[in-house]
Amino acid sequence: QKKNPLKPEFARYGAFDVLRENNEVRINELFSQMTKSTAEKGSVEQKIADLYTMGLDSARLNSEGLAPVKEDMEAIMAVADAKQLSQIVAQIHMQAGNPLFGVGVSADLMNSNLNALYIQQSGLGMGNRDYYLDEENAALRERYTAWLTKAFTLYGMENPAEKAAAVVAFETKMAEKFRSNVELRDIAANYNPMSKADFTKRYDAIDWTAYFEGMGIGDFDTIIVGQPETLDAVNQLVKTEPIETLRTYLAANYLASAAPYLSDDIYAAYFEFFGRQMSGQQEMRPRWKRAMSVPNGLLGEAVGEIYVSKYFPESDKQRMVQMVKNLQTALSQHIDALDWMSDATKAKAQEKLATFTVKIGYPDKWKDYSSLEIDPALTYWENLKRASAWYTR
């Protein structure tokens, strides 16, 4: 450790971090080259270059301040009923926030041939319920409250400390009903299919028609509820908590999502808590790394296609594919030669081997980003919201 001191921007540093660092340098060089030429409007090169440039433009970000979130924040603080709340929750979910609960589509755990709609416990600003409930985390809760107070102050809210305390109290009530990490490991206990009718009747504090419409989720028959009793508690909180508390909670969640892409003052406050206090980082990542990570995340396959064209040509991929095929052939021959395995079992083993799918380096068909619009005339945050919504849909 003395010979290899931890870099201040890292909370940990290992072999995979070295590989990631090397790739970040390569990707940054590719992005820098893109900014030096004029790409065709609508091309992935234009989208990558514009996102990267906006992320680097600290002067513009600082000039805009928190103006990019003003319209959304005003809508959040104007929420007056269940329908408006449900619409705002959907909007924040589309922008990568996570208030009240988490919704997503993934393979059905009991039938991998199907995709299923899932709803899970989510919505805690600090993520883990233990941060709210364990006495040993009292100091962390104070720092979290300080972050919220700072964020609300920078936005210009009245009584920011009081509002921050209300958010922490609300999230603590949620955390009390969250399942522990150990309980979440029980797959069967966290797989609870419900019909759409039963689901919307049981959790009636949310206007699900408005929510699903806002999320772009069409009609469905069944939804998998991860933690029914947790959602019961959230449902009750939405019914009984003052509307002002719900608004402020949504505002806190929204600002935490937006802060890394706004002016330096709010990002510094965000980093102080989420980077330094929560993760142990001593310094912010350099701006170029933060700017580079955005198009790399949102346009990952487009970046990958450009990357492999330079660093992993088709000829290298085919060599690796052939190597894997050789291994498959060798394994097949090995199965046939086993004297302790019955013919029926060998046939099953060969059948299983034949289903092996080879994926090397990059896909045969790349994701199409043509319908995603990146407009440099809009703010950085507005573009990220649009991109996140596009990706979620």
Regions picked out by a protein language model, each given a short descriptive name:
Residues 3, 114-116, 338, 371:
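Generic secondary-structure boundary/loop-capping signal
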Residues 26-322:
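Noncatalytic, helix-rich "gating/capping" subdomain that lines the substrate-entry/channel surface
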Residues 11, 106-108, 122-124, 129, ...:
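Short capping/connector residues at structural and topological boundaries
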Residues 13-18, 42-43, 195, 207, ...:
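Secondary-structure junction/capping motif
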Residues 1-32, 185:
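N-terminal mature-domain "stem" immediately C-terminal to a signal peptide or N-terminal signal-anchor/transmembrane
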Residues 2-9, 149-159, 355-357:
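Short amphipathic alpha-helical segments with coiled-coil-like heptad repeat character
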Residues 173, 202-205, 224-228, 285, ...:
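Intrinsically disordered, low-complexity linker/terminal regions across diverse proteins
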